[in-house]
UniProtKB/Swiss-Prot annotation:
Location of the protein in the cell: Cytoplasm
Name of the protein this chain belongs to: Protein LSM14 homolog
Annotated spans, Disordered: 172-292, 325-358, 402-451
Domain Sm, first and last residues per copy: 1-81
Biological role stated in the UniProt entry: Does not appear to bind RNA.
Lineage per the UniProt record: Eukaryota, Metazoa, Chordata, Craniata, Vertebrata
Domain of life: Eukaryota
């Protein structure tokens, strides 16, 4: 076979440096990235070649695979490209698809993912002019692949994105062929190695210039019947009807849920099982305002709003809150033995001096140990502040109040404790059953001995309770 026969579209047997053989159709060769792409390939495994990791063959036929030129060990041309058959120019043909055995690889450079890949004509005129091949070794192509740049590698993300686009295009084309309708995306679907098999005819305004692949277009004088537009309109009408029917069905389900809740709340009905979170309800359209958005008659008057606030009064109130003076009424000195101390100059001088000192202390004192909260936890207190049970019980009662004693089940309240039990009952306070609120160790007893105060029990040295 002469060198003028194109290699693109030939069946290629490729062996990688891992001794794994792949067999598929040569789709294209990228000279910039030094990659080779095989379409419709099969994995034949390592076969009998010596390798550390033998791989068995697989029966699946994959869409495509990209090889780096530096990782290819050997190439063999198994079969030349098969001749292409074209359909007759019949205006009655709306859409057709060829079998999987017939593929076309001549318009390689027009594909989106491989826009930089050269066509066969570049290789045909330069390096393969004097090469003859049959089922023998493809030595010349192997030498060219080894002269490619080995520093660049194909990106895995790009290959995965290309593979997903091929499979999605194939699925969408199959659904369109089964429904018998066309789509404006059919021109883009043709630009993939697996979609080149299908031969479709559309109106002349959507067709690219005719090529040697075998696409035929009907004469422009005879327009095609508008079957596709009718099917699209009917589908849109069905969607609108389904949307209209969905709202009454949702209202009906909502009413049924309300009736079921009423039946459960009836006096003769058995009590419903109590859950943890209660009824969540459906995801209906609740809380929607039906009176429309709020409307205002006029703009907001900032001047009248600011006139209601007096800056001086606000500042005065703020400064009054910052002052921490003692508001005790002044003591009126009573006369002693019928004599008024105010008559003596010494007493008057001493009282004036004491008043000045008190005012100075009152203005500089911001913390009163006799009134402040939690003053007993100060670091200046060197005494041992280990609280007794009675002290902590009193503090809990003053802080949180007394709990209800008729609480049953796993009641009580969480927090610092329920005021019952040793050390404030940190955890699940109260009792876990029984007929009262026993006050025992760490949250109460689990038994049914209720109603007895903790003070009724005797303490022993080993912290055991005597009945």
């Amino acid at each position: 076979m002469s060198g003028g026969t194109p290699y693109i579209g030939s069946k290629i047997s490729l062996i990688s440096k891992a001794e794994i053989r792949y067999e598929g159709i040569l789709y294209t060769i990228d000279t910039e990235n030094s990659t080779v792409v095989l379409a419709k390939f099969a994995l034949l495994g390592t076969e009998d070649r010596p390798t550390d990791r033998p791989i068995p063959p697989r029966d699946e036929v994959f869409e495509y695979i990209i090889f780096r030129g530096s990782d290819i060990k050997d190439l063999t041309v198994c079969e030349p490209p098969k001749p292409q058959c074209s359909l007759p120019q019949d205006p009655a043909i709306v859409q057709s698809s060829l079998g999987s055995s017939s593929t076309s690889f001549q318009s390689v450079s027009s594909y989106g993912p491989f826009s930089r890949m050269p066509t066969y004509s570049q290789f045909n005129q330069k390096s393969f002019r004097s090469t003859k091949f049959g089922r023998g070794r493809f030595r010349q192509l192997n030498k060219i692949l080894r002269t490619f740049e080995t520093t660049t590698s194909a990106s895995l993300s790009q290959s995965s994105a290309v593979g997903s686009s091929f499979t999605s295009d194939a699925r969408s084309l199959k659904t369109q062929l089964s429904q018998g309708r066309s789509s404006p995306h059919l021109d883009t679907l043709r630009k993939s190695p697996t979609m080149e098999q299908s031969v479709q005819t559309t109106p002349a305004s959507h067709l690219p210039p005719p090529g040697p692949v075998g696409r035929r277009s009907p004469p422009p004088a005879r327009p095609l019947p508008s079957v596709n537009q009718r099917t699209i309109e009917s589908q849109e009408q069905k969607r609108v009807e389904a949307h209209r029917l969905s709202r009454p069905e949702a209202d009906q389900l909502r009413n049924e849920n309300k009736d079921a809740n009423k039946r459960q709340a009836a006096p003769g009905a058995p009590p419903a099982r109590r859950g943890r979170g209660g009824h969540r309800g459906g995801r209906g359209r609740f809380g929607i305002r039906r009176d429309g958005p709020m409307k205002f008659e006029k703009d907001f008057d900032f001047e009248s709003a600011n006139a209601q606030f007096t800056k001086e009064e606000i500042d005065r109130e703020f400064h009054n809150k910052l002052k921490l003076k003692d508001d005790k009424p002044e003591k009126v000195e009573k006369p002693v033995n019928g004599e008024d101390k105010g008559d003596s100059g010494i007493d008057t001088q001493n009282s004036e001096g004491n008043a000045d000192e008190e005012e100075a202390l009152a203005s500089n004192c911001y913390y009163d140990k006799t009134k402040s909260f939690f003053d007993n936890i100060s670091c200046d207190d060197n005494r041992e502040r280990r609280q007794t049970w009675a002290e902590e019980r009193r503090i809990n009662a003053e802080t949180f109040g007394l709990p209800l004693r008729s609480n049953r089940g796993r009641g009580g309240y969480r927090g610092r404790g329920s005021g019952m039990g040793f050390r404030g009952a940190r955890g699940r306070g109260g009792q876990r059953g029984g007929f009262g609120a026993p006050r025992g160790f760490r949250g109460g007893f689990r038994g049914t001995r209720g109603g007895r105060e903790f003070a009724d029990f005797e303490y022993r040295k080993d912290n055991k309770v005597a009945a």
